[in-house]
């Protein structure tokens, strides 16, 4: 993750390496809530051996956050250099009013404990839903397809990022591949970027 105005490295997106040819999304979809819980904390434990002066962004399914009380408590006591990305915000549309209220309360609890929450793969169809709910988070990430769709229509891109800032402090664009696109994203109001234009530099393990 890179800051657009300074090109300063902000942090790393923590991913799970699967064997070649394996569908990662299908793998995680079939995992039980308990297995997902264990996976998240295996990642957190592994990060203790990496530099601590940088942020690490971890994916977390929305329903795991809603339903697992033990996970909430453990996250609240986790390292201050971790950011949680809710990886499936589209599931928002399937939640009941009670589940939405529970999710919002848990987001507030985590952020109050110093653990930032982001929405992953935000797209145009989510604008009205999230802004009308008056939810406020630390960050949102627009997926690369949304950026590529909007990059040639500057006014629409600016409007999308403006709405993004109503929901979150930081707006990250995925899919910037050229310095021209970087400039467009920056002047349209985005604050951060991941992948493509910058080399994938891995942190040294202690």
List the predicted regions and their residue ranges.
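Short, well-ordered alpha-helical scaffold segments within catalytic/effector domains
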Residues: 37, 41, 100-104, 154-158
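Conserved anion-binding
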Residues: 78, 89, 107-115, 120, ...
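Alpha-helix N-cap and loop-to-helix initiation/capping positions
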Residues: 31-35, 95-102, 149-152
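Hydrophobic/aromatic residues located in beta-strands of well-ordered beta-sheets
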Residues: 56, 82-84, 117, 171
């Amino acid at each position: 993750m890179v800051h657009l105005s300074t090109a300063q490295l902000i942090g790393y997106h923590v991913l799970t390496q699967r064997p070649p040819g394996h569908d990662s999304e299908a793998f995680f979809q079939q995992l039980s809530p308990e297995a997902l819980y264990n996976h998240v904390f295996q990642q957190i434990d592994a990060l203790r051996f990496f530099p601590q002066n940088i942020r690490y962004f971890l994916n977390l399914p929305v329903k795991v956050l809603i339903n697992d009380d033990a996970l909430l408590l453990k996250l609240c006591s986790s390292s201050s250099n971790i950011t949680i990305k809710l990886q499936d915000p589209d599931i928002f549309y399937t939640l009941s009013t009670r589940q939405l209220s529970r999710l919002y309360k848990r987001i507030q609890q985590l952020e109050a404990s110093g653990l930032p929450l982001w929405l992953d793969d935000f797209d145009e169809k989510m604008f009205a839903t999230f802004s009308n709910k008056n939810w406020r988070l630390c960050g949102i990430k627009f997926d690369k397809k949304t950026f590529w769709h909007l990059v040639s229509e500057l006014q629409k891109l600016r409007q999308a990022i403006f709405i993004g800032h109503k929901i979150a402090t930081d707006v990250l664009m995925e899919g910037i591949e050229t310095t021209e696109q970087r400039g467009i994203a920056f002047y349209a109001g985005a604050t951060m970027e991941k992948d493509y234009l910058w080399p994938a530099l891995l942190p040294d393990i202690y």
